[in-house]
């Protein structure tokens, strides 16, 4: 599973997931399913934000090409992926600026058009079950919940899906592709079932022992557009949208 994650996700997404797991004292070598889940969630958050701006008239627009003459503001502030201290700093700043109620738990995004925090969920189970779990945990009407599944289903607070159909279709297609690629490698069942995951982990560890002496080569390919991710990610005054040119999973 770890090899799959490193091949199928952009290196910056992988790096952020590694930092998140390290912050919580989790070992990605052991909790490989969680590693894959975090990378998937991060990518969905980026894709949710991608290309969405607010123009001078305060209208939400979708722009896929940079126009240096356009005075545009990013519609979404990405909170997910930051360390906890920085994330809460961003949340507090948003609350002070907009008057929004401070959430009890760290949300994933803030929508400047609708003036609300958003909690993104990606589930391997039934969307309505995961939605209810999120709602019961958050217990706040001020945080909007949007759940996606790997089967193309989705569920959102008051059936308000925030994004246009095309933007949501991009996310659903990516999730379906991840599922298919996992299935092709025999990883999907273990990703869904904890029991299967334990069997897969034992199998992977045994395989690593057998291959310990073999030379390895790691791909470091990064699309040119994604090289702007790190400075854009850390800079609240981002100047360009994160492009949706995520690395495609190489065929085995």
UniProtKB/Swiss-Prot annotation:
Keywords: Decay of host mRNAs by virus, Eukaryotic host gene expression shutoff by virus, Host cytoplasm, Host gene expression shutoff by virus, Host mRNA suppression by virus, Host nucleus, Host-virus interaction. The keyword Ubl conjugation does not apply. The keyword rRNA-binding does not apply. Pfam families: Flu_PA (PF00603). It comes from the Viruses. InterPro entries: PA/PA-X (IPR001009), PA/PA-X_sf (IPR038372). The record marks 28, 65, 202-203, 206 as: Important for efficient shutoff activity. The active site is at 80, 108. Its main location: host cell. It is found in: Host cytoplasm; Host nucleus. The probable endonuclease active site in the N-terminus and the basic amino acid cluster in the C-terminus are important for the shutoff activity. The C-terminus acts as a nuclear localization signal. The C-terminus is recruited to host protein complexes involved in nuclear Pol II RNA processing. Plays a major role in the shutoff of the host protein expression by cleaving mRNAs probably via an endonuclease activity. This host shutoff allows the virus to escape from the host antiviral response. Hijacks host RNA splicing machinery to selectively target host RNAs containing introns for destruction. This may explain the preferential degradation of RNAs that have undergone co- or post-transcriptional processing. Belongs to the influenza viruses PA-X family. This is Protein PA-X. It comes from Influenza A virus (strain A/Port Chalmers/1/1973 H3N2).
